[in-house]
Swiss-Prot record:
Entry's free-text remark on domains: The RRM domain is required for binding mei-P26 mRNA 3'UTR.
Disruption-associated phenotype: Viable but males are sterile. Male germline cells are arrested at the transit amplifying stage and over-proliferate. Males display reduced copulation behavior.
GO BP term, example: male germline stem cell symmetric division
Protein name: Protein tumorous testis
Keyword terms: Cytoplasm, Differentiation, RNA-binding, Spermatogenesis
Gene expressing this chain: tut
Main location per the UniProt record: cytoplasm
Native source species: Drosophila melanogaster
Subunit structure: Part of a complex composed of at least tut, bam and bgcn; complex formation does not require RNA. Interacts with bam (via N-terminus); the interaction is direct. Interacts with bgcn; the interaction is indirect and is mediated by bam. As part of the bam-bgcn-tut complex associates with twin; may recruit the CCR4-NOT1 deadenylation complex to mRNA 3'UTRs to mediate post-transcriptional regulation of expression.
């Protein structure tokens, strides 16, 4: 395979990215960029015996890879995991069977699982003097997001759930917000949204949805109460 003609390799901070050079239909590209068909590869050796290029070359035996994001530490060694997507999202199930077997044949015991594609962050303990609209604007300056839900769990006490386009975007936002967390108060904290449902704290609150593009606000149906939604 002529690797260089098919794939482009780049690095930003702790992520080595290998992306197809193929021009894709915009609708398909949008789905892929939102994490459709994403796989999570783990148990990658932390030395250089299992390079990002090698993984893509093996994965390409099944079909053309759209992107692989390979995580490294400050020394350039693998952090033990990576994310992989095929252009053909229907290959996801086949890949979970084929790739572990193929890696074992090549003496590499990598695990291949569906990616959770976690793309939501929770901002808590924000200074009470900051109103939701101010937090919205400050967060938008740090890193673009697709939507934010704002829950009032006590009078004038809010927590914020930010949704990003995909896991990679959320990870970048997480790091940038941590670096700027003092903007939101001495005790402010940003973390990943987990299965331990934080929304239970919001029962009995109220909810509005702001349509930012039209600069107007409308009340959300009762079943969605408990939040502001920008």
């Amino acid at each position: 395979m002529d690797f260089e003609s098919k794939y482009c390799t780049s690095q930003v901070n702790g992520t080595i990215t290998i992306t197809t050079r193929k021009v894709l239909d915009e609708n398909l590209k949008s789905l892929l960029d939102e994490g459709k068909g994403e796989l999570f590869l783990s148990c990658i050796p932390r030395n250089h015996s299992c390079s990002p290029r090698w993984i893509v070359e093996v994965a390409s035996e099944l079909g053309e890879v759209y992107i692989m994001r390979y995580k490294i530490d400050f020394s350039g060694n693998s952090r033990g995991y990576a994310y992989l997507q095929y252009i053909n999202v229907d290959l996801k199930e086949s890949a979970m069977q084929y790739l572990p077997m193929r890696f074992r044949q090549l003496c590499m015991c990598l695990r291949v699982e569906p990616s959770t594609n976690n793309r939501e962050l929770v901002l808590k303990n924000v200074e009470s003097s900051l109103r939701p609209w101010q937090v919205y604007q400050e967060m938008l300056k740090i890193h673009p997001f697709t939507i934010v839900r704002v829950y009032e769990y006590q009078l004038d006490q809010f927590f914020y759930i930010f949704e990003y386009r995909n896991n990679d975007s959320a990870a970048s936002a997480h790091q940038r917000v941590r670096n700027s967390i003092r903007k939101f108060g001495e005790h402010a904290h940003i973390s990943w949204l987990t299965a331990e449902n934080i929304l239970s704290r919001a029962s009995g609150s109220f909810c509005f949805q702001r349509e930012v593009s039209q600069n107007r606000t409308r009340r959300v149906p009762p079943r969605q109460k408990g939040c502001f939604k920008f």
